[in-house]
């Protein structure tokens, strides 16, 4: 469906678009094209004003029940009015008088084509739309947006590129076309903070209708923004909640969905047209309950995120619109062109609000000499922070590959620099309290982080990024450090330049960058299980196909050996984490054990009942040899003796030397096997 967004329906960015109420005199002076724009108001008016409304007679005048109180009456017959009273907004007949809006209410019936609407209908739609506050103009003030979505406070002023009239038109045309949309834009143009808000607005106005050419029944469904991490769900939902003029979730168009969500973050009065911020796993449980699907951080290739893309593509007729948002298409453009049916590609040009300077610090050691390379890197980092120092009261972020490196680099820097040092990553509790210290300190703060800070938390006073250019890529029973991709570099660099000018200092040669195929270093059971649930054909229906298909087929055989029905698997997928696929054998044994095992997966609390149950699975590991690492840590070189990766080598750390065998409880807990 080719449909352009008329100017009067732009979302108010409170910069050059404001909420506005049009007068009948203004309508009289408009061109026919401008007048026809009001025909589209019939869709939001039917949904939000006329739904369950009826005709009443109020002081002798026929009106809609949403205009005035009165006794329900039979509607009058309507021909051409003999007189128009613009001041009273009424059509006058010889036998009766009817309000502009009531006239339109009676004329806008199912199957009526909107290009047939005459001036009389359009004037009534203008009045109904004014009451809903759905119109906008280039003149106005922020306070005019109060109440547009039931908000008590005005919308935020947003000068970002994604809310310009040009971008709004382009995004609307793609949304209403029902084609899959791939949206890119530089960090700082407002992809995640503004585009979901814009799609919420379009959904509020026009969502649920099969066409905008004529009046039909509608099926209202919310928008969902699917994200890879809980931290992102909380961050972005709070940002959009505030920018729409709300201070509380209840009654707002914003809802959150993630596992073990606290009571205070549940919207008890959600809107049918609203937007749900959800983790990928919970998005999959009710994927077809949503009209518009937005998948963010596509470049990360989160496993469940990639599965959602595959499922949505397979069942695209069950979703009205799908948006894939990513910082860059460097790694995925060609695959998306082939994989998605007739995709639309939108790029929002623009950059961060403030300039970012780049500084390259050369490491003279070759990365193949890993230990020497890292020691040189740490020396270079100290020099760089001394030369390129954040101002007092500001902060810098050091990006390293792993949690262990966070502690290693913090210890090294603390001995050599007089600044406040902090660590932030996904396993750190009470990040907000750390940020309070960062924001309140008059000193320079240096935050050492994993790739977690690429997107999960916005640091408002950061002015400098120190990027080591590496990431730890987990693999079954291990993992390795790799150099980052261009998209990861763009994300890290974009952490500055939002509030003040920034500096991006990088310590790696750009030639080292490469795309990361995460699927080649993942457990593949989720691909098998969700393929069964959603009737995907493997491997061709997968967004990213593993290089080694033998592992995919071995995983399928292993899952089949559990002798668990597809129906039971689907229930397990919807209710439990199953961080180890073998836990499924325990979840089906009894509700009491399932509850305790679920609690262990969520909180880490290991009861004796759960431990004994997991030990019964005999997840055996053979210890080949060991070596002393430091005071209370020994590195054990082992071989996996169970599952798809039987025979795979693994490295396990333990507080004392072991020989023989150990049993795996989780990816971090191991129990020595008693040799007696």
UniProtKB/Swiss-Prot annotation:
InterPro entries in alphabetical order: DEAD/DEAH_box_helicase_dom (IPR011545), DNA/RNA_helicase_DEAH_CS (IPR002464), Helicase_ATP-bd (IPR014001), Helicase_C-like (IPR001650), NPH-II (IPR021892), P-loop_NTPase (IPR027417)
KW ATP-binding (keyword) present: yes
EC number: 3.6.4.13
Superkingdom to which the source organism belongs: Viruses
Catalytic activity: ATP + H2O = ADP + phosphate + H(+)
Subcellular localization(s) per the UniProt record: Virion
Effect of residue 147 to A: In strain: Garcia-1966
Mutagenesis or variant effect for residue 595 to K: In strain: Garcia-1966
Helicase ATP-binding domain boundaries: 172-347
GO cellular component, one term: virion component
Impact after mutating residue 33 to T: In strain: Garcia-1966
Induction, as annotated: Expressed both early and late in the viral replicative cycle.
Residue ranges of domain Helicase C-terminal in the record: 366-542
SUPFAM superfamilies with a match to the protein in the record: P-loop containing nucleoside triphosphate hydrolases (SSF52540)
Family from the record: Belongs to the DEAD box helicase family. DEAH subfamily.
Main function: NTP-dependent helicase that catalyzes unidirectional unwinding of 3'tailed duplex RNAs and plays an important role during transcription of early mRNAs, presumably by preventing R-loop formation behind the elongating RNA polymerase. Might also play a role in the export of newly synthesized mRNA chains out of the core into the cytoplasm. Required for replication and propagation of viral particles.
Name listed for the protein in its UniProt record: RNA helicase NPH-II
Organism, scientific name: Variola virus
Phylogenetic placement of the source organism: Viruses, Varidnaviria, Bamfordvirae, Nucleocytoviricota, Pokkesviricetes
Gene: OPG084
């Amino acid at each position: 469906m080719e449909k352009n967004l008329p100017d009067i329906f732009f979302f108010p960015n409170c910069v050059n678009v404001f909420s506005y109420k049009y007068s009948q005199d203004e309508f009289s002076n408009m061109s026919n094209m401008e007048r026809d724009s009001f025909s589209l108001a019939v869709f939001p008016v039917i949904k939000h004003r006329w739904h369950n409304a009826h005709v009443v007679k109020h002081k002798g005048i026929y009106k809609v029940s949403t205009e005035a109180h009165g006794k329900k009456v039979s509607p009058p017959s309507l021909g051409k009015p003999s007189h128009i009273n613009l001041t009273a907004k009424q059509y006058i007949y010889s036998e009766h008088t009817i309000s502009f809006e009531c006239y339109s209410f009676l004329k806008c019936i199912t199957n009526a084509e909107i290009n047939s609407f005459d001036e009389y209908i359009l004037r009534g739609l203008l009045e109904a739309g004014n009451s809903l506050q759905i119109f906008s103009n280039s003149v106005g003030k922020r306070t005019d947006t109060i109440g547009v979505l039931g908000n008590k406070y005005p919308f935020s002023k947003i000068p970002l590129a994604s809310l310009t009239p040009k971008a709004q038109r382009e995004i609307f045309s793609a949304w209403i076309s029902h084609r899959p949309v791939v949206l890119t834009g530089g960090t700082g143009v407002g992809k995640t903070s503004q585009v979901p808000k814009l799609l919420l607005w379009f959904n509020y106005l026009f969502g649920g209708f099969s066409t905008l050419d004529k009046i039909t029944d509608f099926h209202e469904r919310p928008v969902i923004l699917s994200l890879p991490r809980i931290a992102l769900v909380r961050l972005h939902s709070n940002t959009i909640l505030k920018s729409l003029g709300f201070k509380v979730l209840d009654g707002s168009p914003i809802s959150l969905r993630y596992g073990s969500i606290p009571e205070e973050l549940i919207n008890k009065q959600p809107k049918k047209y609203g937007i749900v911020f959800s983790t990928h796993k919970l998005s999959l449980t009710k994927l077809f309950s949503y009209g518009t699907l937005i998948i963010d951080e596509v470049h990360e290739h989160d496993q469940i995120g990639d599965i959602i893309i595959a499922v949505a593509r397979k069942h695209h007729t069950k979703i009205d619109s799908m948006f894939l948002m990513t910082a860059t298409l460097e790694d995925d453009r060609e695959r998306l062109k082939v994989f998605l049916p007739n995709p639309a590609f939108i790029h929002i040009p623009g950059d961060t609000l403030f300039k970012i300077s780049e500084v390259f610090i050369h490491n003279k050691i070759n990365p193949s000499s890993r230990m020497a390379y890292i020691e040189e890197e740490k020396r270079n980092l100290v020099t760089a922070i001394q030369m390129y120092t954040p101002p007092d009261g500001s902060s810098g972020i050091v990006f390293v590959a792993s949690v262990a490196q966070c502690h290693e680099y913090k210890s090294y820097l603390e001995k050599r620099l007089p600044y406040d040092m902090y660590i932030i990553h996904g396993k750190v509790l009470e990040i907000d309290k750390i940020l309070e210290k960062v924001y309140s300190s008059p000193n320079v703060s240096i935050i050492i982080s994993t790739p977690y800070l690429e997107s999960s938390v916005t640091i408002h006073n950061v002015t400098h990024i120190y990027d080591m250019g590496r990431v730890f890529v987990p693999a079954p029973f291990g993992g390795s450090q790799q150099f980052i991709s261009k998209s990861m570099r763009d994300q890290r660099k974009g952490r500055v330049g939002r509030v003040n000018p920034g500096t991006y200092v990088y310590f790696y040669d750009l030639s080292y960058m490469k795309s990361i195929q995460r699927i080649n270093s993942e457990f593949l059971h989720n691909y098998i299980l969700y393929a069964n649930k959603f009737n995907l054909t493997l491997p061709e229906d997968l967004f990213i196909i593993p290089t080694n298909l033998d592992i995919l087929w071995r995983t399928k055989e292993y899952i089949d050996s559990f002798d668990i029905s597809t129906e039971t698997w689907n229930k397990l997928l919807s209710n439990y984490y199953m961080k180890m696929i073998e836990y499924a054998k325990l979840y089906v044994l009894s509700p009491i054990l399932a509850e305790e095992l679920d609690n262990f997966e969520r909180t880490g609390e290991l009861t004796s009942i759960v431990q004994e149950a997991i030990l019964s699975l005999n997840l055996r590991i053979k210890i080949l040899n060991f070596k002393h690492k430091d005071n209370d840590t020994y590195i054990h070189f082992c071989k996996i003796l169970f599952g798809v990766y039987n025979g795979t080598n693994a490295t396990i750390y333990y507080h004392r030397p072991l020989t023989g065998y150990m049993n795996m409880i989780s990816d971090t807990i191991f129990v020595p096997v008693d040799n007696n």
